């Protein structure tokens, strides 16, 4: 699997096919038992997650993993750039999610699912990542917030030149934003290519739940 710099790459497949495991291997939660992971020409397979974060990889997992007893502001501070010892919130990142600016003193656990997802993505963006990795960012999210998330992903790709890698099941969302798609079946890449491959009936059958 080769992920192109500056592109939005979507990984799709039925539940249980290894999509989340793949993302967690990229960011260092698992080590590959076969093959290796190259990033900018360097094998990073043995690096710990924090070492990969220093290289510019940021991850928004399924479930968001925000801190429920920390305020929104405190949650955001946990994502500040560990490379630059920055201790100020980036107003540009906050401007992408206006609702968060209104909730800085609220506890993370008091937010709705959609608000928590915005918080999780904003926290990752505060790391100023070169590669943003998201695991099903639209899961359980209302349409209005899905649009916000879509606009943010496109913005950071086009303006910040950030490489985006995401696992996603929502067809319309993928067709709107993806440059390339990898279809995973039983832990292997079944097919890959431009987003137009999703129109293939065989692909739709593979992805049918």
PLM-predicted stretches and their roles:
Residues 27:
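Helix-to-loop junction immediately C-terminal to a conserved catalytic motif
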Residues 70, 111, 124-125:
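ABC ATPase signature
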Residues 107-111, 115:
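Conserved ABC ATPase signature
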Residues 126-130:
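A short, proline-enriched helix->beta-strand linker immediately N-terminal to the Walker B motif
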Residues 43-63, 102-105, 198-204:
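ABC ATPase NBD coupling module
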Residues 35-42, 55, 88-95, 191:
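Conserved ABC transporter NBD signature motif
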Residues 12-14:
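The feature captures the beta-strand-to-loop junction immediately N-terminal to the Walker
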């Amino acid at each position: 699997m080769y992920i192109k710099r500056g592109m939005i790459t979507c990984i799709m497949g039925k539940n249980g096919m290894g999509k989340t495991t793949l993302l967690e291997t990229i960011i260092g939660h698992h080590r590959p038992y076969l093959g290796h992971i190259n990033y900018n020409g360097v094998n990073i397979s043995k690096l710990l997650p924090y070492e990969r974060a220093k290289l510019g990889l940021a991850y928004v997992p399924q479930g968001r993993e925000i801190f429920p007893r920390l305020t929104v502001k405190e949650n955001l501070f946990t994502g500040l750039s560990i490379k630059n010892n920055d201790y100020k919130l980036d107003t540009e990142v906050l401007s992408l999610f206006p609702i968060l600016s209104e909730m800085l003193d609220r506890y993370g656990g008091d937010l709705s699912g959609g608000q928590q997802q915005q918080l999780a993505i904003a926290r990752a963006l505060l790391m100023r990542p070169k590669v943003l990795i998201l695991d099903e960012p639209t899961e359980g999210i209302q349409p209005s917030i899905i649009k916000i998330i879509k606009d943010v992903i496109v913005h950071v790709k086009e303006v910040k030149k950030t490489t985006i890698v995401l696992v996603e099941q929502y067809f319309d969302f993928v067709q709107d934003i993806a440059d390339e798609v990898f279809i995973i079946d039983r832990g292997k890449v079944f097919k890959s290519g431009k987003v137009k491959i999703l129109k293939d009936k065989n692909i739709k059958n593979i992805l049918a739940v």
